[in-house]
Amino acid sequence: MTGEDERIEMEIRKRNGKSVPFQQEKIFNAMKKAFDGQGKEIGSREMDEILATVLNNLSVTVPLTVERVQDEVERTLMERGHYEVAKAYILYREKRSALRRVRHTIAQTVGDDTLDEVLRRIQMDFTEEVYSLAALQMKFESFCRPGMTEDERAEALTKAAVELTTAEAPKWEFIAARLLNHSFRCRNAQEWEGRGVCDLYGRLRYLTDKGLYGDYILAHYTHEEIAMAEDFLCPERDELFTYSGLDLLLKRYVIQSRSRVPLETPQEMFLGIALHLAMNEGSDRMGWVKRFYDMLSRMEVTMATPTMSNARKPYHQLSSCFVDTVPDSLDGIYRSLDNFAKVSKFGGGMGMYFGKVRAAGSTI
């Protein structure tokens, strides 16, 4: 096969302006898909010859761009008489261009260039027509008003995805969750950047110093163990959330500042719970941290509300249900009410047994 040297030396300029090493395998795969899509058989020798022609013609092109490569593939296919395949390739190229345009329009309207990659992943994972981003764009634009801030536009985009969720198109709730998560992670990164903190240990130290994190976590784990635990984090597992689930977590369960600003990501929350649950393990403690984290972050198990809320925090009441026997005295009754309030404060459910209290009118 010709073009091997060019593949090593050449670079290609992508649509975002970045230059990356040129990979001829991508051309081969794209042409193979075009032939397969038309049900056309083509021998490996002829495919190699087509690829060699494309590469030889591209070797004189500086700078090399994605559009130039695609133009050359189309021309070579038609020169060799593969008109139906070339037509399918052109239509596929136009479809991809339309997908890019809607992504670009949404990202530009919001004012967030990093949103483009999130939208690209959505297009890859939700290919049914009912989840077309064109529908999201139309709904989003109906919510936009002059003078909206970037955060307000991002919120409107998420709201648009939520409103598109129906019984016939339930996966819009997962799309809405991805949009919400992107907005949250951007704000969260800015919060920590403003505080000059760049790693998990630094974040835990900051939260501990502010009284938001239990000091027992850093007392049980070394700096190196926290760094090891940080490697366990899998941000892509945020994609398992529905919008309602993620929204609830961000509002009620992740650690927040005194001014109600979330300072913990959902994955850091799961890891913090795992660190708490495994801290007294005698052997292979970090292995248990990873096991607990994986079970939680993959949604394989669900912890009780107090565990989700309080593990890793200063007041770590982890149990769900309590029963208190109310004594037959005024002091005892009010002491039970005091216990009820304290348990409820930290998320515990409370039951009260009044069997010891005499009925009204009984003999004293």
Whereabouts are the PLM-identified features?
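Extended catalytic cores of very large enzyme megasubunits
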Residues: 1-364
